[in-house]
Structure formats: structure tokens, C-alpha cells
Amino acid sequence: MRAWILLLAVLATSQPIVQVASTEDTSISQRFIAAIAPTRTEPSAASAAAAAATATATATATTALAKAFNPFNELLYKSSDSDSDNNNNNYKNRNNNNNNLNKGPRNNKNKGNKHSKSDANRQFNEVHKPRTDQLENSKNKPKQLVNKTNKMAVKDQKHHQPQQQQQQHHKPATTTALTSTESHQSPIETIFVDDPALALEEEVASINVPANAGAIIEEQEPSTYSKKELIKDKLKPDPSTLVEIENSLLSLFNMKRPPKIDRSKIIIPEAMKKLYAEIMGHELDSVNIPRPGLLTKSANTVRSFTHKDSKIDDRFPHHHRFRLHFDVKSIPAEEKLKAAELQLTRDALAQAAVASTSANRTRYQVLVYDITRVGVRGQREPSYLLLDTKTVRLNSTDTVSLDVQPAVDRWLATPQKNYGLLVEVRTMRSLKPAPHHHVRLRRSADEAHEQWQHKQPLLFAYTDDGRHKARSIRDVSGGGGGGGGAGEGGKGNGGGRNRRHQRRPARRKNHEETCRRHSLYVDFADVGWDDWIVAPPGYDAYYCHGKCPFPLADHFNSTNHAVVQTLVNNLNPGKVPKACCVPTQLDSVAMLYLNDQSTVVLKNYQEMTVVGCGCR
């Protein structure tokens, strides 16, 4: 009977009715009663016991009433969509000062007919699952019993709304409730206004936090690529850029135009290939060619010349004496000759001679002369100037190298007096002519051209073009090293600060922005020079780029002046600029190519690649 009276009292009031989605749960009845309770004062122990007993009896009566015929079944089984629309309409009507408070429930009734009772019960059970985290938070808050119950009622009602509508109405509902000054407010609205903790929770819940907000971002390492990857993935420059690159390289190579040659008709001597490999730092097992030009440490160019056949050669019919002629006009006049050597290849002796024990023990003497004056038949003998002599054995030496620098110097000074060289082979015991052909000047009839190219006599001229600069004190002493950590592969301690054990540079989080060496690969095929440049096909020039932060660490390979400049810039940026990231040490690149006269040239170009970077 008390339950019927309670429901009639609710219908008689002019305030909005808080709708309950289901009456089969006794906790919902308790929330319903607590929501419409007119008082908020803390009840005494006796009052609390009486209220609990009354609530239990009321809940039992309400449950029994819901199972029987009830004219308010449609109202009690309204869907969550109608509840959300009802609340939204109530808020809008209140902001517009609309006193028609019964319009919302009437509209909700029409919308509620679209949903079945089974769907409403299923959705109601899914929404009202126990929330352990909310109950634990509510226990820690020192609030009144009524406020706790009302807060749960508000949350249950808000959970009826779909997720998208709930996110859209979070902020408008909060603003409307906080700014509303009307006197007609339901108990739920009053609780919503007076509970700041609930409003704070709604604002926090409305913030969208990315899923990876707490993830740790690992430090990215600088990208490194192999030379094959750089060649494969590099961008082709436009034609105008190619012309500029070609002009710059021609100026660097001291050429007016690229040589036009037929590469198929030229064979690179094996001696030049070995010399190139040795200069590039490769270890070779059998290299017994003296290189006097390299001992000067200033020759940066090596040229090879082959023997030019002439009718004069017929005047030397004997196998132990022969004439060699080399055309050295292709050597520029501005280059200074540092050394010159003659390389002779000895043919294998006959099997009978090799098998002879005495022949294996026999030593031979090779002599080379500069023909300073030709002879006239019947009038005068030719004049010779002994240049060098070498002693060789049959079973030990395959090549013979002789120093002929005085003769080449005379040829460069007076080209018209280049009469060639005279080579003579004798035995050491009797100083008689050697009985076997040790050196050949012409290709045999049954010998391939390529085989003869590797065996023919060669003249090597070592010159210096004077374009390279003298090494500084820092480079010679090793203090100008490769830039340490700033140079990526540089050698030496760097910065002139020689230390026995230099500590490893500190790793920066954004180390790509600091001064360091970057890759810059130059491919000769891009400018169409791969037809006359034998080796290498390209090279990595590198470049320096990055910031010089304050304070300058040791691995930045900085000078004392750069340290002072950085300090002054940090104190007064407008007075002096920051230190710049520049190359601190450069290295040379050896190139093997062909010139216009089809001469094989091995040139060591100075300051072509960056070894270390630093702040200067």
C-alpha cells in the first residue's frame, strides 16, 4: 500500500520524473527512493535503521507491483535512446526558459514504443555491470550517505546514453547545470551542481588520450647506406647540373675537355693496376717494382709509356743489345719530374737451359744507357751515357726496374734530342753477351696482342703538378687527426689536444643535428666519364654539416679560437657568430685514367675526400 502512495506522490509533483529502466533489481529501487528524497541531512542511527527497513519493504512491494499489471510498464521499460533524448530536451528547454516540462516525457513515450522489452532489458544489464574501480574511489571520498547514493544514480542514468551522445553532451550538460539559476530543479540536477568532484570526473573522462601516450620513443640512429645502395637510390641530376659538375671536375683534373678515346683498343698494364691497388692500401703478395717517385712523397702523378717501334731498331740485330724509344711529350711542362724507371719483363728460358744447374746459378747484369748522340755510318760512333745497372738471376726475378730519370729530364728539356735508351745484358763472370734472349721488343707471330701488352717494356714517369699544399704542423704531428667522434672514421685524437686515452664522446639524444660527417657519393658515370676513367667508378667525397653547440666538447675537434668564439657568442650572440662545422682533415683519391694520347695515368688528387669534421 505504501508503494502505491509513493508512486501517486511522484505523479502529483511538477518536477521531472527520474525514470527507471528495470524494477527487478532491488538496488535500482533503492536508488530511485534516494533520488527523490527531499532531505540531505545526516540521519541518526535510529533513523538510518528505520530508513533501511522502510527501503527494504518498499523495494519488495515495488518488485511485486512490477510483476503484476501496471499501467506504467511502458514508462518503466523505456530504452536508453529515449532517456538520452529526454535529458537532452530537458537541458535545452531549461536554457531557453521553457516551462513546458512535460513535453520531454511525452516525446520519450512515443520513441520508446520502437524498442522491445527484451532489447531494453539486455542493454540495461550490460550497462549496469558492477564497476569495481568506481566503488573503490567512492569509498575513499568522505561524502554523506545521500550524496553517495545520488552520485550512483546519476552515473547509472548517464550510462543509459550511447557513447557518442554521452561524449557530445558531457560539456553542454556541465555548463548548463553550473550556469542555471532557475528555481525549478530536480534533486538529481541539484546534486549535479553541488558535487564538484563529479564535474571534474566528467571533464577528465572527456579527454581523448592516445593509445601510445605512455610509450617510450627510442632514440633513432643515423641512417647509414652502403655504396651500392647509394648508387642505386641516388637521384639523377638535371642536365644543367651535370654541365657544372663536368666543368668543375675538368678544372680539378687540369683538363680543357674530356679525352675522346676508344677504350676497347687500350689495355691497362698489370703493373699500373698493381701500383694503383698498393696506393689504395691493399696488401699485395708479389710486388717487386721499385717506385722511386713514391719515395719523394711529393709526386702525385704516374704515367706509363710503351715502346714505339722504329726503323732504327733494325740497327741492333743482336739479342743482347736493343734500343727502346718512348714518347714523353704528353707530360705537361708545368709538372716537375720526380723519378723515372724502366721496367723490363724477362721471358722464360728454354727447358734445357732451366734444367741446367749451372744456368740456374748464373747471374746476369742488365745495363741501360742514354743515347745522347746518334752515330753516322762510316763517320762516327754513337754516344752513350750509363744510367743504371742491375744484377738478376734466372730463377728469382721476373721483372727488372732501372732508374732512367736523367734521360727523361733531358728529353723533357730538349724533345728533339730524344734518341731513346740502349739496354745490354751480360753475364757476371765473363761480362760477355748473354747467350739467351732475356728481353723481347716485338710481339711474336703466335702471341696474342693482350699477352704482349703485359710483357712489353714500360717507362714510368713520376711527376708533381704542384697543386697540392704542404701538410700543416697539425696534420704532420697527428694532432689534426680525423676529427674523432665528429669525423666518423677519422684518425688521430683531433683538435690538437693529444691525449693518451681520449674518452669516448658523449652520445647526444639528437646527435644528427651536431657537427659531423655526411656521405656524398660522386659517380663518374653520371657525367659520362666512365669510358676514360679506369678506376675508381666513383668515390665518397663526404661533407661536414651540423651545429656547434655550447660548450664545445673534445670530440668536436675544435681549436682554442673556436672555443673562445663559442663562449663569446653564448654571452653576446649579436657580437660574434657561432663556430662553423668545417672539414678538419682531407685525404687524397687515386685515379687511374687515360689521356688524349692514350697514355695510362695514375694520379693522386689531393684534398678530395673529407676524413674528419670539426668546429672552427
Swiss-Prot record:
Stretches with biased composition (Gly residues): 477-496
List the GO molecular function terms. Answer: cytokine activity; growth factor activity
Q: Where is the composition biased (Basic residues)?
A: 106-115, 497-509
Q: Where in the cell is it found?
A: Secreted
Composition bias (Basic and acidic residues) maps to 116-139
Q: Where does the record locate the signal sequence feature?
A: 1-23
Q: Which InterPro entries match?
A: Cystine-knot_cytokine (IPR029034), TGF-b_C (IPR001839), TGF-b_propeptide (IPR001111), TGF-beta-rel (IPR015615), TGFb_CS (IPR017948)
What the entry lists under Gene3D superfamilies is as follows: 2.60.120.970, Cystine-knot cytokines (2.10.90.10)
Q: Which residue pairs form cystines in this protein?
A: 515-581, 544-613, 548-615
- Annotated region (Disordered), positions in chain: 80-188, 470-512
A GO cellular component annotated for this chain's UniProt record is: extracellular space
| Biological process annotations from GO | cell differentiation
Low complexity: bias regions: 86-105
Record carries keyword Secreted = yes
Which tissues is this chain's protein expressed in?
A: Expressed in the imaginal discs associated with establishment of the proximal-distal axis of the appendages, and midgut mesoderm.
SMART domains membership? TGFB
- Which residues lie in the propeptide? 24-474
Instruction: List, as start-end ranges, the regions of compositional bias called Polar residues.
Output: 173-188
Instruction: Quote the SUPFAM superfamilies the UniProt record gives.
Output: Cystine-knot cytokines
User: Would the keyword Disulfide bond turn up in this protein's UniProt record?
Assistant: yes
Family according to the record = Belongs to the TGF-beta family.
PANTHER family reported for this sequence: PROTEIN DECAPENTAPLEGIC, TGF-BETA FAMILY
**Primary role:** Acts as an extracellular morphogen to establish at least two cellular response thresholds within the dorsal half of the drosophila embryo. Required for the proper development of the embryonic dorsal hypoderm, for viability of larvae and for cell viability of the epithelial cells in the imaginal disks. Acts together with scw.
State how it assembles: Heterodimers of scw/dpp are the active subunit, dpp/dpp homodimers elicit a basal response and scw/scw homodimers alone are ineffective in specifying a dorsal pattern.
Q: What is this protein called?
A: Protein decapentaplegic
**What gene is this protein translated from?**
dpp
